[in-house]
C-alpha cells in the first residue's frame, strides 16, 4: 500500500509499505493492506513503518490519518 507522511513544512515520507503502526488518540493501531476505510486523529507518539522486512520509526506530534483503497495519508503537526 502507498503511504505519505506530510507536515505543514514538507513531505516527510512517500513510498510503498507493508504496514504502518500509528499512535491513535484512543490507543495505537496498525493499518495493513486492504484495511477498511478509516479517518482517525493521532496523538504524540511513534509511527512505525514496515517495508521489505525493515522497520523505520518516526515521532509524530499529533495529526490526522486517512486510509482508503490501499492509500494512507498522514497529516502530522510535526515529525522527528
Predicted segments with their positions:
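Compact, glycine-rich, soluble single-domain proteins
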Residues: 2-80
Amino acid at each position: 500500500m502507498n503511504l505519505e507522511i506530510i507536515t505543514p513544512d514538507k513531505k516527510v515520507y512517500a513510498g510503498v509499505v507493508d504496514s504502518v503502526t500509528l499512535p491513535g488518540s484512543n490507543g495505537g493501531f496498525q493499518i495493513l493492506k486492504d484495511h477498511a476505510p478509516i479517518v482517525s486523529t493521532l496523538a504524540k507518539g511513534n509511527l512505525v513503518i514496515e517495508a521489505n522486512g525493515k522497520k523505520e520509526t518516526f515521532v509524530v506530534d499529533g495529526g490526522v490519518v486517512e486510509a482508503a483503497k490501499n492509500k494512507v495519508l498522514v497529516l502530522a503537526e510535526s515529525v522527528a
